[in-house]
Structure formats: structure tokens, C-alpha cells
Amino acid sequence: MGIKFRLIVMNFLQYAIWGSWLISLGAYLGGGLQFTGLQIGSFFATMGIASLFMPALMGIIADRWIPAQKLLGICQLISAGFLVAAASQTAYGPLYTCMLMSVMFYMPTIALSNSVAYNALDLAKLDAVKHFPPIRVWGTVGFIAAMWFVDLVQIGGVQIKLTYWQLYVSAILSLILAIYSFTCLLYTSPSPRDAHES
């Protein structure tokens, strides 16, 4: 499997995970669970909260102790676990907590996947400025494909986007990417200088 194809698959999955619920979650929360507009908005605010510090924290860990592709897999596993837990919740408090924790571990994976891609292209002696954009566009394709899937596919005569099944779809994709990260992505070592300084 060529390096560019591996990175295309990684980007496709990375953003398909997000596309499975980002656009449709509001329909489930408002329609299926009858949450208020303020409550629904708070779920989307979790991404901003997580982005304040989690990417930087995971970046430090990847730089010093754990290879980026391994940390990517670990974060995806944890995020998937919280998505599964979220799918079984119907009360605002527990569901919000599960989604917040899931997003806490998902948001850093965006930067981690970029780091893995740039490192892999560098190891393959490919110009990242030239080769990364066509790879990254497959992330957008993955997002749209997942969004269409939950919009169009029905379970028991009900669109997935109106049910908790969208969270299971996202969790399954997250698990697949975790396994893929552990088995198919090139090794990205922590910085020897940073590890020594720590």
C-alpha cells in the first residue's frame, strides 16, 4: 500500500467520524430528545472548549513520549468509547458529559493526523506543499460521504440522523481509524531532543 494511499484512507476516516454527527446531531437532540435550543447549542460548544487546550496537550505528549500515529489511535479509541456511552444516554447531563469527553479526545486527532501525514511525506521525500492538499481533500470527501450516509440511510424506517445510531456510526469509524493507526501508518518517533530535555 503506497504512502499517499495510506494517508488518503487516514484523512477519509478522520473526517468521516466528524461528518457522522456534526451536521445531524441537532436534529436528534431537538427532535428525538426534545432538548432546548440552548442545550443543543451547548453540545456544539464542546468543540471550542476542547480546542482550547487538548490539541496543545496531546501535541506535547506526541513530541515527547508517544509516537503521533499511536497517540492518534489511542485518542480515537477513547473517543469511540465515549460515543458508545453517549448513544445510550437520553438525559441532558450524562449525554453532554459523554459528548464533551468524546470531543476532548477527537479534536486533538485533527492536528495529530496532519502531523502523521507531514512526517510520512517527509520520510518518503515528497514535498508536503505539493502532495498534502490532494490527500487532505479526501477528508472533505469522507465528511460529506458520512453526512450523506446518516441523512439517507434508514434503520427501522427512521433516518439515522434522527436517532442515536449516528453516534454508533461515528464510533465504528473511530474504532476503524484506531486500528488503522496502529497497523498501517508509518512510525513517527517523538523528538529525541524534546525527550532528552524532559
Language-model features and meaning:
Residues 12, 93-109:
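Hydrophobic core of transmembrane alpha-helices in multi-pass small-molecule transporters
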Residues 70-83:
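Structural signature of the two symmetry-related core transmembrane helices
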Residues 48-52, 56, 144:
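Residue-level signature of mid-helix packing/kink "hotspots" within the transmembrane helices
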Residues 187-198:
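Single conserved hydrophobic/aromatic residue that forms the stacking wall/gate
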Residues 2-48:
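Helix-loop boundary and gating motifs at the non-cytosolic
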Residues 54-66, 154:
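Helix-to-loop junctions at the C-terminal end of transmembrane segments
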Residues 166-181:
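Symmetry-related core transmembrane helices of the 12-TM Major Facilitator Superfamily/SLC fold
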Residues 106-135:
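Cytoplasmic helix-loop-helix junction between adjacent transmembrane helices
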